[in-house]
Amino acid sequence: MPINKSEKPESCDNVKVVVRCRPLNEREKSMCYKQAVSVDEMRGTITVHKTDSSNEPPKTFTFDTVFGPESKQLDVYNLTARPIIDSVLEGYNGTIFAYGQTGTGKTFTMEGVRAIPELRGIIPNSFAHIFGHIAKAEGDTRFLVRVSYLEIYNEEVRDLLGKDQTQRLEVKERPDVGVYIKDLSAYVVNNADDMDRIMTLGHKNRSVGATNMNEHSSRSHAIFTITIECSEKGIDGNMHVRMGKLHLVDLAGSERQAKTGATGQRLKEATKINLSLSTLGNVISALVDGKSTHVPYRNSKLTRLLQDSLGGNSKTMMCANIGPADYNYDETISTLRYANRAKNIKNKARINEDPKDALLRQFQKEIEELKKKLEEGEEISGSDISGSEEDDDEEGEVGEDGEKRKKRRGKKKVSPDKMIEMQAKIDEERKALETKLDMEEEERNKARAELEKREKDLLKAQQEHQSLLEKLSALEKKVIVGGVDLLAKAEEQEKLLEESNMELEERRKRAEQLRRELEEKEQERLDIEEKYTSLQEEAQGKTKKLKKVWTMLMAAKSEMADLQQEHQREIEGLLENIRQLSRELRLQMLIIDNFIPRDYQEMIENYVHWNEDIGEWQLKCVAYTGNNMRKQTPVPDKKEKDPFEVDLSHVYLAYTEESLRQSLMKLERPRTSKGKARPKTGRRKRSAKPETVIDSLLQ
């Protein structure tokens, strides 16, 4: 029995936020930029210095985990992504996404260099982790793993694994499923190598471009989704299905046109990217602000798809990527502020038990039906087995007209062993037929034809049996049995992850011990400072405290000034977007006013409505108007006239001067294109023109 949502255990967790700082790249070194970011991995703090202002105090941010420029890919995975993927394998939804300015290493964190095991990112490492877990599961547990890959390019959702990557897909929502993409292709995978091949295929179709800040800049947001269904026996003895979805999101970076040098198509892409990231920031702000009653999920495709990941049914980890150069000071501060705000988002994740859109139970049911068919044998008609059986399968039935009719019984079941026996019997009868020389030629041909017919039917049954076996094998390949070694090449990667995880645990214990010792020393120092032996020492102590408070005051003032500047920049950006939209709106209104009459404009406005699902205006009942109806209506053939149609053009419907004039005008011969009358024939002569006749009649 499916469990109601209210009965499912919920875990209320905050969004986990980690920060990763990349090292200075070659371009920044050649331009002699200074390092403005300091990372303290033990304390979990990021400190940003403003190098061109010595009076301004540094800004410090604290997060769950921070990674410096020397951090390893395996450490990043084990500390951040491993807990999320373990939760997905238990049946929770999970989301991992990288956020930050363009060129800060988001794609490297998520994907890395797949050819080198030590440099693989979160997505490839998750493949080995998932199938490593399946290989260690119990033998009666069944798994089904499927993947999909999409991108959001210029606010259009595209399928990176479909035949046509430029086709625009629609975002839909259902109460039982939630937000989903209509017609998005998904592929069932059996091992980590299959996943890697599919990801490589989708990555080739992704939109990338070069800017001044990044040669391989992602021009779209990409979401790689892994759906893991698990079927195992519950306490009640019944089989229960759990389904976890893992969304691995690689966001395009926010960018400034002055720094990236984007023009033309790149500028249009940057505008759309910045708008969607701005909406993401607004969603984060609305979720954190307790007073906000509306969360603008629908303002962009990205936030609509991440609706469950931010404040919904999901365990979410956000990796904020920053650059260390003082050149990107403003962008780094902005990213850290958004990340600091996202820490306060609360999600309510629950295990998805017996979901309606699970495929594992459907596959298992089909496998059982196919096995049952194969055990019982194929269905072939009684006449296909043998001549003697054909006589037994027919029995007389007398109808109302007294004539005898034959009724065929049900179909016979033929097992594989029975097929072998039948084949041997057919061979024996063929040999016996060849040895009988005293038979008539007609009887021999008849017997041979009967044997060929039976052999053909037997061959057909064997082919159907083989087809069922192949279908069963294909379905069983899709369903993965727990405890089977599926790692292949990924086994080495899983081993590497395990070793790195053990090493991290030891380092974490040592770091925790050092942190406790450091706190104790700090407390001892404070206690010593509190004990003054003279007024002079007390004055020195008070002066130190005063300096600390003064530093904090200056930091608060600097923070306020930075916030005002950032707010001003956001306002300017929004105003620029408004000006651009206003120009486009004026152009559209000019076209409409010059080509569509005012009455029709009002009619269109009355019958138009906004469709939230596809983000477009739609006209009501447009299917029953214009060309749509003209396509369905058959065009009458002008050459063929209706035999029942009567020409009533010459009949007076009213005896008025105008009707008389019109009826006589029709008698005039048609004129040629030059305006001259056609030559008169000998049969038909008119003494006067119609105008003369009309005038005479009226007089």
UniProtKB/Swiss-Prot annotation:
Positions bound to ATP: 100-107
Biased composition (Acidic residues): 376-400
InterPro entries: Kinesin-like_fam, Kinesin_motor_CS, Kinesin_motor_dom, Kinesin_motor_dom_sf, P-loop_NTPase
Cell location: Cytoplasm, Cytoskeleton; Cell projection, Cilium; Cytoplasm, Cytoskeleton, Microtubule organizing center, Centrosome, Centriole
Compositionally biased region (Basic residues): 672-687
UniProt GO cellular component terms: axon cytoplasm; centriole; centrosome; ciliary tip; cilium; cytoplasm; cytosol; extracellular exosome
In-chain residues carrying the UniProt-annotated modification Phosphoserine: 687
GO biological process: anterograde axonal transport; centriole-centriole cohesion; cilium assembly; microtubule anchoring at centrosome; organelle organization; plus-end-directed vesicle transport along microtubule; protein localization to cell junction; protein transport
Keyword Kinase found: no
Alphabetical keyword list: ATP-binding, Cell projection, Cilium, Cilium biogenesis/degradation, Coiled coil, Cytoplasm, Cytoskeleton, Microtubule, Motor protein, Nucleotide-binding, Phosphoprotein
Coiled coil: 355-590
Boundaries of every Kinesin motor domain copy: 14-345
GO molecular function terms attached to this record: ATP binding; ATP hydrolysis activity; microtubule binding; microtubule motor activity; plus-end-directed microtubule motor activity; protein phosphatase binding; small GTPase binding; spectrin binding
Complexes and interactors: Heterodimer of KIF3A and KIF3B. Interacts with CIMAP3. Interacts with CLN3. Interacts with DCTN1. Interacts with FLCN. Interacts with AP3B1.
Function: Microtubule-based anterograde translocator for membranous organelles. Plus end-directed microtubule sliding activity in vitro. Plays a role in primary cilia formation. Plays a role in centriole cohesion and subdistal appendage organization and function. Regulates the formation of the subdistal appendage via recruitment of DCTN1 to the centriole. Also required for ciliary basal feet formation and microtubule anchoring to mother centriole.
Family as reported in the entry's similarity comment: Belongs to the TRAFAC class myosin-kinesin ATPase superfamily. Kinesin family. Kinesin II subfamily.
Protein name, per record: Kinesin-like protein KIF3A
Organism field: Homo sapiens
